Amino acid sequence: KTILFLHGNAGNLFNRSYKLNRLNELNLNVLIISWRSFSGNLGKPNETNLYGDAKKAVKWLNDKGVKTENIILYGESLGTGVAVEIGQTNKFNSIILESPYTSMIKAAKIYYPYLPVKFLLKDKYESEKKIKNIKTPILIMHGKKDDIVPCYMGKKLFEIANKPKKFLQIEEDDHMLSFNDNLLLEIQNFINKY
């Protein structure tokens, strides 16, 4: 199996090295891509382009002999919206969402409650509307102390998602999960099950 890691908005690929090192302990292949305009890449990181980047990564893996049904989509924060979008094909092995939001509009309303964000935001990432279309197994992980994307958003997606599904609320973590041994074991058990 191969994890396709779709990273979040802040930082760069190096900032995910501790997660990738932990995932490497599971004896899986891991491919992480850098979005347009991240880590020195050119281009505009809009919703359509990020979906396209992820689809190209899937095609690249397919061209290297990795079947789609052996790919685990792993979305982190911003990347969760991309994972939900392309996961609707239901061809993937499973999907893991770390610190997901219900939609970019609802997440933005938390920070800008008096602005008409629905009309100002071009990129919507409406996972709340799309996740019901996914039939593959889903693991949703969220830190209880997340002050960027509230944990209730992950719980809401879990409620809407089809079975099989699992929700992990990590009591001591915030937006970026610590990837301790307990969390790694939960991820391993989920991956081994499917």
Mark where each language-model region is.
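Primarily recognizes the serine-hydrolase "nucleophile elbow" in alpha/beta-hydrolase
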Residues: W60-K64, T68-Y112
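Mobile cap/lid helix-loop segments that gate and shape the active-site cleft of serine hydrolases
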Residues: P100-T136
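Short beta-strand/loop motif that positions the catalytic acidic residue
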Residues: N133-K135, I140-D146
